[in-house]
A protein has these predicted regions:
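Short helix- or helix-capping micro-motifs
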Residues: 1-3
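Mid-domain, small-residue-enriched loop/turn segments at the edges of structured enzyme/sensor domains
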Residues: 12-64, 68, 75-77
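Domain-terminus/edge residues, biased toward the C-terminal soluble/receptor-binding domains
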Residues: 48-53, 57-241
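Acidic/histidine-rich, surface-exposed loop or edge segments in extracytoplasmic proteins
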Residues: 6-11
Length: 241
């Protein structure tokens, strides 16, 4: 349904939500949860409507959510063809044929929006998402996204800063059987940074001023921030290990 606009799928989702307006409300709620600050849905089709809009940054956020939270479904976006009811339809993302590192994600076109594309590619440990909106043709959108991807892979790299379960530090515990508790991250933390800039990263762990027992594994005890040239790249909770 994400690659080809099947009316049947739209009708099913609208039916499950109790109508198109309630379905749009659900989409707006989810968009808010994802931090999509410049997006508002009015329908399930994506067709133009007065108060139906999004931004390139918000579409990137949505793409990132799909890639990270639904890896079991993400492979569908790399399929070059889809057959339904004995009709074989090509994926309109032409970059799938041009660049082996591209594995998604979604094209779009209306007269008002122009030719749009949200694409993702992975080379080595680095995954990038590139978005264009309002281009003049399907070829133009492919070329512009390819330029952005090539630029990104040339000048940026992805580094793993923290491993899941890795001890960042130990902190004093008051009133417990143990004097200290180890703190760390619940999952791997990656950043994409300009090549050669890892040594310039600054990490700061801010723990609660007083940590009192009882403490169980997974309790949030503070936050870790990673800064590069004054910009905060990571701001995540640190937990008891």
């Amino acid at each position: 349904a994400a690659r080809e606009r099947f009316a049947d799928v739209g009708n099913v989702t609208i039916h499950l939500a109790g109508g198109e307006d309630p379905f749009a409300d659900l989409m707006n709620q989810h968009a808010t949860q994802l931090g999509m600050e410049n997006t508002h849905y009015e329908n399930a089709t994506g067709l133009p409507s007065e108060n139906h809009y999004s931004s390139a940054r918000d579409l990137m956020r949505l793409a990132r959510h799909i890639i990270l939270d639904y890896p079991e479904h993400y492979a569908i976006y790399s399929q070059k063809h889809f057959t339904y009811n004995n009709i074989r339809q090509p994926n309109r993302n032409s970059l799938l044929w041009r660049d082996d590192s591209v594995d998604g994600l979604k094209t779009g076109h209306t007269e008002e929006a122009g030719y749009c594309l949200v694409a993702s590619a992975k080379r080595g440990e680095t995954r990038l998402i590139a978005t264009v909106m309002g281009t003049s043709s399907s070829e133009a959108r492919a070329q512009e996204v390819q330029k952005m991807l090539n630029y990104g892979f040339r000048y940026f790299e992805t580094e793993r800063l923290f491993r899941a379960g890795q001890e960042l530090m130990a902190s004093r515990v008051w009133g417990g059987q143990a004097d200290e508790v180890s703190v760390g991250m619940p999952e791997d933390i990656y950043v994409t940074i300009p090549r050669g800039s890892r040594e310039q990263l600054e990490s700061v762990v801010d723990l609660d001023s007083v940590i009192k027992a009882p403490i169980k594994v997974g309790d949030e005890l503070g936050r870790v921030r990673v800064v590069l040239d004054g910009e905060t790249l990571v701001d995540e909770p640190v937990l008891a290990l």
